[in-house]
Amino acid sequence: MLLEHIHYFAGIVFIAVAALLPIIDPFAGAPIYLAMTSGLSPEERARTAKLVALNSFLLLLASILIGAYVLDFFGVSIPAVQVAGGIVVCVLAWSLLNGPIAPDVPASTTLASADSLKQRAFYPLTMPLTVGPGSISVAITLGANPPRNLRALLTTTLAHVVGVLITVVAIYLCYRYADRLVRRLGKTGTNIMIRLTAFILLAIGTQIIWNGARTMLVGVLHPGVAATAPAAAAAPRD
């Protein structure tokens, strides 16, 4: 019985990490994070990385636990979230694609206040750069059908907490040491990687918009067609 619960717990953790980490992709986002915090000192950048990780943890966990209920309360569908969020991602990606990569401003001249760091850490660094509409949609899907068995519900919730924690640790490490990655790439390599990542981010935003719009169109043209979700791990028996 214990082995069955351990297997179920590990399966939920694996599903959460496997679903969230690839779509967030903090390694690819690290150069963009560094470019958007180029005016900060190394200490401020490290502090901001912690704030982004904390914000990401709270946002992802809230999306898993109550995201479906919040959307249902306001009458908002996941496709609507995808379309709106995809537009925000596209706007951010477009500004990165066409804007300056790193302004030549010494870090010592741009000491940011705590409030300023918190604001920047949430928008745009946490949302939509790190936790965008795609990862929020995935998180909501992960928590959309909680088990009715109390023990299984507690196990699932704890597993989701662990899965999100593993994901945000990866986010923190990639952002915290983004400067080392960029140093290895050099200025030209960093410029190329940021532009390429911004273009990929633009394509992802466009795809997210299309996914949401296509689901809406299917609902209008074929109202009887129900979207099917991937099967979740089976809850262990008491």
Where do the protein language model's features map onto the residues?
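Membrane helix-loop-helix hairpins that form the core translocation module of multi-pass transporters
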Residues: 46-100
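Juxtamembrane transmembrane-helix termini in multi-pass membrane transport proteins
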Residues: 12-64
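Transmembrane-helix boundary and interhelical-loop signature of multi-pass inner-membrane proteins
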Residues: 41-42, 62-84, 170-214
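Juxtamembrane helix-boundary/capping and inter-helix hinge elements in multi-pass membrane proteins
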Residues: 35-46, 79, 114-117, 144-152, ...
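Low-complexity, proline/glycine-enriched hydrophobic segments characteristic of transmembrane helices
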Residues: 1, 214-238
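Transmembrane helix exit motif
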Residues: 88-110, 204-215
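Structural signature of hydrophobic alpha-helical transmembrane segments
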Residues: 12-29, 78-88, 157-171
